[in-house]
């Protein structure tokens, strides 16, 4: 009974954390996203000499063809399952970023000896830490994303996310548990090692500037266009901005069924690692015709059970030698 109580309690707190003020789906984040979307909508309407009406804005932001699509209902089911049901499993199976940080400090101390903190201004140390933590987060995200696209047995799990035929904010957690755990742990290791090295060098002042208890850079991203990555709203960045940041259009190209867009734009908030490793594709300013989904295998993802079970089967097939049947065996 104690286990069941802990399971229910931890799951409840995990779910609630996503909706707290500092959570990704907290009221400040979602309200600011709506205001940002309104700003984009109003600016475009006025550029065409048309009034910006609230009713039209809401209709364009939440079109019936998307809100009532079967893909959206699957988004809802997987979103609820991953947050409210499986949340505790993720917290138990995830590496502790703070633990990695402390282990890194200990390892550096053993290898290099005690180190007096560098006497730099606190604001400068925090700025360096904020940027370094963001880059470490993004590198881990890019690397994990690259692996799930590069190796077919991992792609089978990532297909769950790409199976979305339309995209909404909830598509973010249209993910297989294997993928979620992989990303969470990669990010924990990357950011933990980075923060450990910075703490060893600069002392306890090495922590990020925060907004609503999160890295200020990531939170600003979520409070503006971050939630629009998975949407039908075409907002693209060109020039230097398009090389530094992931616009919603960057990620919409990533989900495209056009082979020219495959394996592009693997970053989360930043485009710098895509730029560095040759996986960047800058979207055009005007809306490109983009279709989403994974084609003929969509039927594998029309129920929650299939969505979670089929990737294991298909992934295993990549390691199982194919025995020729009489019909497929080569003929002399």
Segment roles from a protein language model:
Residues 81-93, 105, 112, 116-290:
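Membrane-embedded catalytic scaffold of the fatty acid hydroxylase/desaturase
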Residues 72-75, 268-279, 308-311, 315-322, ...:
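A transmembrane-helix-recognition feature enriched in membrane-embedded lipid enzymes
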Residues 1-20:
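Short, strongly hydrophobic alpha-helical membrane anchors
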Residues 25-110, 129-141:
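Specific transmembrane helices
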Residues 210-212, 284-332:
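A membrane-cytosol interface segment of integral membrane proteins
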Residues 14-21, 63, 67, 71, ...:
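Membrane-helix interfacial "entry" motifs
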Residues 1-3, 46-61, 146-162:
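Short, charged cytosolic
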């Amino acid at each position: 009974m104690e286990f069941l109580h802990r399971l229910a309690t931890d799951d409840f707190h995990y779910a609630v954390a996503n909706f707290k003020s500092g959570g990704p789906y907290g009221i400040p984040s979602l309200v600011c996203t709506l205001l940002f979307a309104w700003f984009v909508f109003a600016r475009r309407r006025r550029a065409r000499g048309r009034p910006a009406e609230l009713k039209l804005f809401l209709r364009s932001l939440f079109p019936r063809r998307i809100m009532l699509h079967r893909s959206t209902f699957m988004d809802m089911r997987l979103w609820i399952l991953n947050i409210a049901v499986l949340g505790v499993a993720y917290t138990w199976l995830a590496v502790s970023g703070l633990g990695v940080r402390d282990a890194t400090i200990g390892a550096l101390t053993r290898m290099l000896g005690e180190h007096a903190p560098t006497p730099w201004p606190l604001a400068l140390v925090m700025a360096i830490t904020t940027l370094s933590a963001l880059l470490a987060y993004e590198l881990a995200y890019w690397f994990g994303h690259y692996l799930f696209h590069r190796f077919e047995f991992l792609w089978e799990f990532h297909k769950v996310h790409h199976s979305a035929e339309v995209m909404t904010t909830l598509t973010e957690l249209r993910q297989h548990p294997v993928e979620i755990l992989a990303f969470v742990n990669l990010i924990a290791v990357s950011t933990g090692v980075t923060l450990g090295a910075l703490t060893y060098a600069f002392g306890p002042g090495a922590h990020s500037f925060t907004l609503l208890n999160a890295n200020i850079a990531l939170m600003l991203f979520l409070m503006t266009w971050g939630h629009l990555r998975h949407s039908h709203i075409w907002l693209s960045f060109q020039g230097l901005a398009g090389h530094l940041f992931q616009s919603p259009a960057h990620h919409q190209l990533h989900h495209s069924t056009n082979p020219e867009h495959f394996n592009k734009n693997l970053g989360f908030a930043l485009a710098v690692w895509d730029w560095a490793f040759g996986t960047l594709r800058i979207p055009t300013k005007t809306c490109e015709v983009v279709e989403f989904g994974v084609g003929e295998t969509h039927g594998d993802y029309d129920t929650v059970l299939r969505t979670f079970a089929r990737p294991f089967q298909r992934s295993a097939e990549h390691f199982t030698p194919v025995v020729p049947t009489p019909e497929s065996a080569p003929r002399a």
